[in-house]
């Protein structure tokens, strides 16, 4: 019991409530070890499904067998009771095998996601944890090159035998006090700290209610979270320890939603859950959120339809030591202590505060972990003896502020120390201040989290905010660089001579209010004017004179107000800011001197492979060779009459037209880009070049022209010699030949560029008239060769060419059936570009649309830019000819559209795990959908002159919001870069699998060749038609 001194200051009521509220119920835990709970269900119900990854399943019996196999393999390479195994895997059906195999071997696992964990954290965890071995997948083999421990591959460790006696579980002496896992908490100062968690810590949460959350056989449980996050242990181990079915979410947003729709219990952070509407997930019965503060609106929305649990607890108290079942309309709290745990709210002297008053939250009981690995001083600082339990157990200082509310639950009120969460990451404010102090000339700095935004305060006042951010960005990741900076000559002080952070906070609030006034003045412009006619103006944030009064103190009573000159720079203000990334020349500083991978193979072989015999040309050649073989065959057989050659002409025209049909193109793209990113890279890099299918179109087009020349010659010969071919057929043939020659001549790249309008007109009208004449020629030729006594209709229906001509005609006509005139909402970005908004359809990412103001004369294709969560799409039209210049000067309010959204080269993005996306100028338009969609980690490189003046703050800011580490290179300021070398730097830094580029033809070909010749998959548009 607690000594009377610790509770003597409380009223009798508060003393009673201290015990009532702060001590959880005593409940017996049925299992002492996590894997023992799993084995109970594996033995009781071996046929039940343990894991279901989008249809790939493992039963409890098979999972148990595989885990035993892995445990035996680990024992054979030196793993013993008490060992630690670094587990570098990913969210998949194999994850439970790895976890249980390690536990059955008597070891603890260190969970690291091979797709996410940084090299520095991986190296630190391997050494700091004292791992006996590293367990990984073959796909992550490169990440463990030079590892200081043996590497075991999960892919190879499972024996093929289905005989349960083949791999016997090793002798098990694990107890509740042994380690189950070690979680490395993220930090921005120093190195990550490993937290030692025991089996007893975990089973106390997952094997009894409420932490059990109703998990039982037949219940489906989501596995949505990063496996390195301790919250993920709740869903993974909780499901397996209770006989439920664990459902990993897959790699795409489509898979993610499919899993969410299929589960009964959903684990999530509030940020992950926020975009989703519970109406869309009727199967979900229970949701538990943790990891960050939960907004009331989110809790109310989901709480109205499901059991909505809000949980809280740092890693050091085992995932969560308080939980609350939210009732819509009530305040959001984190509940009370879970069974066998305690929760205290104490003052600075470690005495309980009265109910309703704010203090520091401490946790105690069965969830308290062993402490920090290899950090005894840090452990003794945060873990202390629990004087209230008085049984020798420990309690932990969470560093969080909270208070007990009247219903006996805790209200979380933020952190008392300098560690905060920003965008889901832990950030040490002192580390941010230290990073800002690395800027030349800075004499002092501090950082505060104010209304969810990271602010930096720096002295003296003559330091550029952009220089401060550049310096901080060299030390800290993007999320730990202040988005707003205030510079001043002196910091306000408290009575004790310390920096008065309350006054600094007030300064920040007043500067935000001043900025809000400026925005309100801009917003007063009528909406229709803002949409159309005013190009954005980039202004510099003004110097703001702020008068901040000191709070009275012993040495400042009666003092006058202190005037502080503060320079405000807001990184997220579209009117007054430029992203720090646009101004940090160090990102590309010295890139031309980087050591780059050598080009593979000899120069001749490289050029043959990547330039002369590109996949496009190989497909062209295949079509051409097939036609050559057909020519040889009919010559040998002497079956080259005009009728047969005419059929071959039609077959080639059919293929050429169909390979440009929107539905056919989309089908090719959907099939080839559906290959998952888990497949070997050589398969994915080949399938991703599906956009080279234009080679089939060109091959068939050229072949049809050559066959038409042969047909013309043969038909003329037959006509002269009195054969079957009539004069009218030959006459029509010469007209068709002339039209096709005209199309081919104007399609020649040099002429097409110089005479683009002429090309458009000839290509369209000669193509239409040629199609009509093909019908006439076909009918004439059929009549010429009509067998005696047979009706024309009977012959036609039996002739394959007749049906080919019908199909290709329908293919050409079909898009015109989807012709419509739609409303356009223009947004003028500058005198160089306009953004056109449409709301009649929402196309998928990676597609382009055709628009026109004169549908019978010309059509123009632009990348469609859908915004996630918003109906409709936009197009970015930049100055590149008469048509674009006309619509930038006079933005349209209506345009014609036809056909369906058609996929382009960036449909391939989800096939890769990490990519560098390169765009020059308006090439950012086709790239934007993939950037906004955020389906994979990517690094964006955008080069253009004066991007904000050219494309406007709104587009630039949206790109930076979706990809905060995007590199924006101002060619007006820095000149034209060496795009190959700059791209190679980003590929190396980002550890990218592949590169995609949207640019002009010469630069696209240069970058693609520069990457491919070094073994890096690269993709860019083909200019073939």
From Swiss-Prot:
InterPro entries xrefs: AA_adenyl_dom (IPR010071), Adenylate-forming_domain (IPR052979), AMP-bd_C_sf (IPR045851), AMP-binding_CS (IPR020845), AMP-dep_synth/lig_dom (IPR000873), ANL_N_sf (IPR042099)
Chain residue ranges for the region called Thioester reductase (TR) domain: 682-900
EC number, UniProt record: 1.2.1.-
Keywords: ATP-binding, NADP, Nucleotide-binding, Oxidoreductase
Region: Thiolation and peptide carrier (T) domain, residue numbers: 556-638
The keyword Nucleotide-binding is assigned to this record: yes
Binding site residues for NADP(+): 685-688, 769-771, 840
Lineage top rank: taxon: Eukaryota
PROSITE patterns linked to this entry: AMP_BINDING (PS00455)
Chain positions recorded as AMP binding sites: 332-333, 412-415
Enzyme class: oxidoreductase
Residue span of region Adenylation (A) domain: 38-422
Coiled-coil features, chain-numbered ranges: none
Molecular function as annotated in GO: ATP binding; oxidoreductase activity
Family recorded in the similarity comment: Belongs to the adenylate-forming reductase family.
Domain writeup: Contains three distinct domains: an adenylation (A) domain that activates the substrate amino acid which is subsequently covalently linked as a thioester (aminoacyl-S-PCP) to the 4'-phosphopantetheine prosthetic group of the second domain, the peptidyl carrier protein (PCP) domain, as well as a reductase (R) domain of the ferredoxin-NADP reductase (FNR) type.
PANTHER family: ENZYME, PUTATIVE (AFU_ORTHOLOGUE AFUA_8G01222)-RELATED, TRANSMEMBRANE PROTEIN
Function (record text): Adenylate-forming reductase, a natural product biosynthesis enzyme that resembles non-ribosomal peptide synthetases, yet serves to modify one substrate, rather than to condense two or more building blocks. The A-domain preferentially accepts L-serine, L-alanine and L-valine as substrates. The natural product of the enzyme is not yet known.
Protein name: Adenylate-forming reductase 03009
């Amino acid at each position: 019991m607690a000594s009377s001194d610790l509770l003597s200051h409380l009223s009798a009521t508060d003393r009673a409530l201290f015990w009532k509220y702060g001590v959880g119920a005593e409940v017996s835990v049925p299992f002492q070890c996590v894997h023992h709970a799993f084995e109970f269900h594996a033995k009781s119900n071996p046929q039940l499904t343990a894991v279901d990854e989008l249809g790939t399943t493992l039963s409890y019996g098979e999972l148990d067998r595989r885990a035993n196999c892995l445990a035996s393999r680990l024992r054979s390479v030196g793993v013993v009771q008490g060992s630690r195994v670094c587990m570098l895997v990913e969210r998949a059906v194999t994850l439970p095998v790895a976890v249980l195999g390690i536990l059955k071997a008597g070891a603890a696992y260190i969970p690291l996601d091979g797709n996410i964990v940084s090299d520095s954290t991986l190296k630190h965890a391997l050494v700091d944890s004292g791992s006996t071995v590293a367990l990984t997948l073959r796909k992550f083999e490169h990440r463990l090159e030079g590892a200081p421990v043996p590497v075991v591959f999960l892919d190879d460790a499972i024996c093929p035998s289905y005989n349960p006696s083949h791999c016997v579980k090793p002798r098990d002496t694990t107890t509740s006090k042994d380690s189950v896992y070690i979680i490395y908490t993220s930090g921005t100062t120093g190195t990550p700290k490993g937290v030692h968690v025991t089996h007893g810590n975990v089973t106390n949460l997952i094997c009894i209610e409420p932490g059990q959350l109703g998990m039982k056989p037949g219940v489906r449980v989501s596995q949505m979270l990063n496996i390195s996050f301790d919250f993920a242990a709740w869903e993974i181990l909780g499901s397996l320890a209770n006989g439920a079915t664990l459902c990993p979410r897959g790699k795409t947003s489509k898979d993610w939603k499919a899993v969410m729709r299929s589960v009964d219990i959903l684990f999530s952070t509030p940020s992950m859950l926020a975009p989703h509407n519970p109406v869309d997930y009727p199967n979900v019965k229970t949701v538990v959120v943790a990891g960050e503060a939960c907004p009331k609106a989110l809790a109310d929305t989901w709480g109205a339809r499901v059991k909505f649990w809000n949980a809280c607890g740092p890693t050091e108290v085992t995932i969560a030591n308080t939980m609350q079942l939210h009732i819509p309309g009530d305040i959001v709290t984190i509940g009370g202590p879970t069974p066998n745990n305690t929760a205290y709210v104490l003052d600075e002297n470690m005495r309980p505060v009265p109910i309703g008053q704010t203090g520091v939250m401490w946790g105690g009981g069965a969830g308290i972990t062993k402490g920090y690995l290899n950090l005894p001083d840090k452990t003794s600082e945060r873990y202390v003896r629990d004087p209230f339990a008085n049984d020798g157990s420990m309690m932990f200082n969470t560093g969080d502020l909270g208070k007990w509310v009247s219903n006996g639950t805790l209200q979380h009120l933020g952190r008392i120390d300098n560690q905060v969460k920003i965008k889901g990451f832990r950030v040490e404010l002192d580390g941010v201040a230290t990073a800002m102090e690395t800027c030349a000339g800075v004499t002092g700095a501090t950082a505060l989290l104010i209304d969810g935004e990271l602010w930096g305060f720096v002295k003296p006042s003559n330091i550029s905010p952009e220089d401060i951010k550049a310096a901080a960005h060299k030390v800290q990741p993007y999320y730990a660089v202040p988005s707003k900076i205030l510079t001043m000559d002196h910091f306000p002080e408290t009575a004790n001579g310390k920096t008065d952070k309350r006054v600094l906070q007030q300064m920040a609030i007043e500067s935000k209010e001043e900025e809000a006034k400026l925005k309100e003045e801009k917003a007063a412009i009528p909406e229709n004017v803002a949409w159309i006619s005013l190009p954005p103006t980039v202004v510099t944030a003004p110097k703001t004179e702020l008068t901040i009064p000191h709070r009275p103190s012993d040495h400042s009573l009666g003092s006058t107000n202190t005037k502080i000159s503060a320079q405000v720079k807001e990184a997220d203000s579209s009117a007054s800011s430029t992203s720090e990334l646009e101004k940090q020349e160090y990102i590309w500083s010295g890139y031309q001197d980087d050591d780059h991978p050598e080009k593979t193979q000899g120069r001749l072989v490289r050029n043959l492979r990547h330039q002369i015999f590109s996949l496009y040309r190989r497909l062209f050649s295949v079509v051409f060779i097939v036609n050559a073989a057909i020519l040889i065959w009919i010559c040998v057989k002497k079956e080259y009459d005009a009728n047969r050659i005419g059929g071959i002409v039609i077959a080639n025209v059919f293929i050429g037209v169909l390979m440009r049909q929107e539905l056919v193109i989309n089908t090719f793209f959907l099939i080839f880009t559906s290959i998952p990113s888990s497949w070997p890279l050589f398969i994915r890099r080949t399938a991703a070049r599906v956009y080279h299918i234009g080679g089939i179109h060109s091959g068939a087009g050229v072949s049809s022209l050559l066959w038409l020349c042969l047909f013309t010659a043969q038909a003329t010969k037959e006509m002269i010699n009195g054969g079957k071919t009539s004069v009218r057929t030959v006459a029509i043939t010469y007209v068709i030949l002339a039209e096709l020659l005209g199309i081919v001549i104007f399609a020649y790249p040099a002429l097409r560029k110089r005479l683009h309008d002429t090309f458009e007109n000839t290509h369209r009208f000669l193509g239409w008239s040629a199609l009509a004449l093909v019908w006439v020629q076909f009918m004439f030729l059929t009549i010429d060769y009509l067998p005696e006594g047979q009706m024309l209709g009977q012959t036609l229906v039996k002739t394959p060419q007749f049906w080919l001509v019908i199909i290709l005609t329908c293919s050409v006509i079909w898009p015109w059936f989807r012709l419509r005139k739609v409303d356009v909402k223009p947004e003028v970005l500058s005198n160089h570009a306009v953004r056109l908004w449409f709301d009649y359809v929402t196309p998928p990412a990676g597609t382009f649309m055709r628009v026109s103001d004169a549908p019978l004369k010309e059509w123009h294709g632009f990348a469609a830019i859908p915004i996630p969560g918003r109906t409709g799409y936009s197009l970015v039209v930049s100055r590149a000819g008469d048509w674009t210049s006309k619509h930038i000067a006079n933005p349209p309010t209506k345009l014609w559209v036809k056909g369906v959204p058609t996929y382009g080269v960036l449909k391939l993005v989800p096939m890769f795990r990490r990519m560098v996306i390169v765009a020059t100028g308006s090439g950012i338009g086709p790239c934007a959908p993939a950037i906004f969609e955020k389906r994979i980690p990517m690094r964006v490189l955008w080069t253009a002159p004066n991007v904000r003046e050219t494309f406007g703050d709104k587009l630039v800011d949206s790109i930076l919001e979706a990809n905060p580490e995007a590199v924006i290179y101002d060619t007006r300021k820095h000149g034209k870069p060496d795009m190959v070398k700059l791209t190679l730097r980003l590929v190396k830094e980002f550890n990218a699998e592949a590169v995609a580029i949207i640019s002009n033809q010469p630069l696209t070909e240069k970058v693609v060749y520069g990457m491919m010749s070094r073994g890096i998959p690269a993709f860019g548009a083909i200019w073939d038609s």
